[in-house]
Amino acid sequence: MAKKITGYIKLQIPAGKANPSPPIGPALGQHGVNIMEFCKAFNAKTQGDEGTITPVVITVYADRSFSFITKVPPMSVLIKKAVGIESGSSVPNKNKVGTLTAEQVKEIAVKKMPDMNAASLEAAMRTVEGTARSMGVEIV
């Protein structure tokens, strides 16, 4: 028989830097999960991408065990990494902070596709372009 699920926890944690302090500790603690066990498993799984914010969905079972799935980093993080900027523009329509090529847009769309609900690569690329525009990044 399958384990009974008691809850899901969604967090965004920097890869390789999970520790028991807030927000991770309290979120897992209220579900009775072994916090250190999760931190060690998460840090081991995300070892290669140090510092990149990684969304994770933790499934908590009735016997207080857990499993987790790491997802692709948020689109804004991927765009900032591709352009090489620290943050987006505060006034995206007036101040442009960088440029993205069509090839970079396609690369980000392909990487993000598993977590998106876009039907095609073209639709995913349009989503990436829209996010980039709202951050003040120009598409070339």
Curated annotation (Swiss-Prot):
One or more lysine residues are methylated. SMART domains: RL11. Gene3D superfamilies: Ribosomal protein L11, C-terminal domain, Ribosomal protein L11/L12, N-terminal domain. Signal peptide: none annotated. The keyword Glycosyltransferase does not apply. The keyword Lipid metabolism does not apply. One of its GO terms (cellular component) is cytosolic large ribosomal subunit. GO terms for biological process: translation. Keywords: Methylation, Ribonucleoprotein, Ribosomal protein, RNA-binding, rRNA-binding. CDD domains: Ribosomal_L11 (cd00349). GO terms for molecular function: large ribosomal subunit rRNA binding; structural constituent of ribosome. Pfam families: Ribosomal_L11, Ribosomal_L11_N. It comes from the Bacteria. Part of the ribosomal stalk of the 50S ribosomal subunit. Interacts with L10 and the large rRNA to form the base of the stalk. L10 forms an elongated spine to which L12 dimers bind in a sequential fashion forming a multimeric L10(L12)X complex. Forms part of the ribosomal stalk which helps the ribosome interact with GTP-bound translation factors. Belongs to the universal ribosomal protein uL11 family. This is Large ribosomal subunit protein uL11. It comes from Geobacter metallireducens (strain ATCC 53774 / DSM 7210 / GS-15). The lineage of its organism: Bacteria, Pseudomonadati, Thermodesulfobacteriota, Desulfuromonadia, Geobacterales. The gene is rplK.
